[in-house]
Amino acid sequence: MRNFVIEPLHKPSMEECRLRIDNLTKPLYSLARLEGMTERMAGILKEEKPNHLRHAVVIVGADIAVDGPQNQTHGVESLKAMERLASGHSATHGAAKKIGADVFLVDAGLELDTSHIEGVLQHKLAKGSKFFRMHAALTPDMVEQGLDVGFALVDELSEMGYQTIGIGTVGERSLLSALAVTAGITGYPMAELLAENNCTLSIQEKAKQLTASLAEHDLPSQDGVHVLATVGSPDVVVLTGLILGAASHRMAVVFDTAETGAAVLAAKCINEAVMDYVFPSVHMGEPVQKAQMKYLGIKPHLFYGFEMDEALGSTMGLSVLDAGMHMLNDMKTFGEASVNVAVDGPGSERQDGR
């Protein structure tokens, strides 16, 4: 993995941005999290009054546990999904178009070949990850290669002028990797991360088996690279590198599902400073995502009953950042609107009539 530096947020820009927010013609702190997100964007971009963000959406494809008993379709479904995404007519593309975001597709580890699909960037680490209950999911070399792919992708996006990235995944059995990475990093009891499904085993039985498998890989661990190599997947690895690279370029990252959340967990293990540059988006209702949010100390803010990946939630999260820019730039301050500022209460301490 390359050497990189993640700088802290630019406090002077944040302070000036917060003063403007507090002087907008609204009750103090009434826009809640939107205000904090906007203030943080000022610190990320080193701009007191950022505006007109340039968004990219990156969807990384990989199939999970391709040698495991659950693999009945052998990549056919994920191939169809990537072909559909490449057509440009997906829900994600529709949402991205509304906010002027460009969508990039990456094959990091789909089981079937995608080289015939126009527009899919070819960075295949392997034809899917292995089933971690049988052996390590990846190799250390694959992890190093995948992290470098993520860094290289964000290098290009930065050079192209993008300031924010919404991330997503596509692939079969992807929640299995997210589950294992989350348990492997957080150390939370496996039973808390599992949901009831049609499996013949009870949650307790599944938890016992999976916990034993993690222990065989010396997990849980705070070594993010080790976790990725033993129970991770190509998409999570590439997104981990992308998140770290984005932070080193002072670019914001929006994530959504448990799969993308697993990449955030791994990135935080490698460098905690990355969290200043990361924003959650949709609430998915999965125990795995709930555990990730608890461990990261953050909360999703979009509640739509989502059950879809493919970066749709992240794209909607980018639109929330846009809403913050509209608040900051389109609303008037008390001074601009020729309105008297508060003479008492909390507002009197923050509103200066600017």
Residue ranges and their predicted role:
Residues 1-354:
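N-terminal loops that bind phosphate or other acidic moieties
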